[in-house]
Design a protein with these regions (language model features):
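Non-catalytic positions within long, well-ordered alpha-helices that form the structural scaffold/packing
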Residues: 79-83, 171, 234, 292-294
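Active-site-adjacent substrate/metal-binding segments within catalytic domains
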Residues: 5-135
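Residue-level detector of anion-binding/catalytic polar loops
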Residues: 87, 137-139, 298
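Extended, well-ordered alpha-helical scaffold segments
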Residues: 125, 129, 133-136, 155-166, ...
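Extracellular glycoside hydrolase catalytic/binding regions
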Residues: 161-162, 177-179, 183-317
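Active-site groove signature of glycoside hydrolases
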Residues: 94-96, 136-153, 162-195, 229-230
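The substrate-binding groove and active-site-proximal loops of carbohydrate-active enzymes
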Residues: 55-72, 107-123, 145-159, 183-196, ...
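Aromatic/hydrophobic pocket-lining residues that form the small-molecule binding cavity
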Residues: 70, 74, 119-126, 159-163, ...
Length: 317
């Protein structure tokens, strides 16, 4: 199976098809070569299997929710994102919060059964996104587990099975443009299984890295909540360091987070990547994005949006 896009890491730079990203490019005097500028678009394969909440996502023109339409329109928009310089998107196998920062999450949105098997309909929608990203030369950061859905796994063995199945599916389908955010914000105190929490999450990152097919494996890391610094155990096993800027009001703190990671004894030359930050202020000289770039860290846009079909971002429809 011939694929067009292959992501690699060379020291602290991301490479696509053997060349550093944004080769030779600077932005406002700062080097962006090797960075992976990205946007959190986690609801690309969203569906809601809870009949009590499914109607929340109905389209204004049809009065019904349609997960295939959601993915189809997502894929149709991807070339526009790429034309504007976006090289990476975050897509979730268990989505994210479809109502922004709502605390309870009664919806059922997961590419896994409670036993950890893959749900074919979700995976076919994921296939269409990965195919388009491969065609466009884009990298997909695939988030495997999300704290709004982990309670539906029957036990820890189901989580291990889910991770194994996800990694094998990506590898067996030949995708070279996927990197893993194994657990989204592992230190958020809503996870119910210990292996998804900070003290043990490094086990999952290591497990993902050990799954091979055809001599290939996936690059992997895991994210922590906004303002948090990853544990040394996680940094030591990760291919790249994931951090979040949500809740970080002072752009100077963004640079401090990057420096703190680089000073950790477990750190070695590898990319540092924000893949979630809901602060903008792009018109100002100082903002979180520029602080990240000036510290030579990739930055990721997060806009929760509204459930109005016009300003959705990660809030369907």
């Amino acid at each position: 199976m011939e694929r067009r896009t292959r992501v690699e890491i060379v020291r602290d730079e991301f490479y696509i098809n053997g060349k550093p990203t944004y080769q030779g490019v600077t932005y406002k005097g700062a080097k962006i070569q090797g960075l992976l500028l990205n946007s959190r678009m986690v609801q690309g394969i969203f569906d809601d299997l809870n009949p009590e909440t499914r109607e929340l996502w109905k389209y204004p023109d049809t009065g019904k929710w349609d997960p295939d339409r959601n993915t189809r329109e997502f894929v149709e928009a991807m070339p526009v994102w790429r034309e504007h310089g976006l090289l990476s998107i975050v897509v979730g196998m268990q989505g994210g919060n479809p109502q922004g920062y709502r605390t309870d999450q009664p919806w059922r949105n997961s590419a896994f059964t409670p036993e950890g098997e893959l749900v074919p309909e979700f995976m076919e929608r994921l296939r269409s996104i990965l195919d388009k990203a491969d065609e466009l030369g884009m990298v997909v950061q695939l988030n495997v587990f999300y704290f709004g859905q982990d309670e539906h796994f029957i036990d820890e063995s189901a989580i291990l099975r889910a991770l194994d199945n996800a990694c094998r599916w990506v590898l067996e389908n030949g995708y070279g443009n996927v990197i893993l955010d194994v657990v989204n914000e592992t230190d958020v105190p809503h996870y119910e299984h210990e292996i998804l929490m900070p003290a043990r999450v490094h086990e999952l990152v290591q497990r993902a890295k050990e799954i091979e097919y055809g001599g290939r494996r996936l690059l992997a890391g895991t994210s922590f909540k906004g303002g948090s610094i990853p544990t040394g155990q996680v940094v030591s096993v990760s291919d790249f360091v994931l951090i979040h800027g949500n809740g970080v009001e002072d752009p100077n703190q963004i640079a401090e987070m990057v420096e703190t990671v680089r000073l950790m004894p477990e750190y070695r030359p590898m990319p540092i990547l924000f893949n979630e930050d809901d602060h903008f202020d792009f018109e100002k000289d100082k903002n979180n994005m520029m602080s990240a770039i000036n510290a030579y860290a990739s930055w990721g846009f997060l806009e929760c949006g509204d459930n109005n079909y016009r300003d959705g971002y990660q809030s369907p429809p």
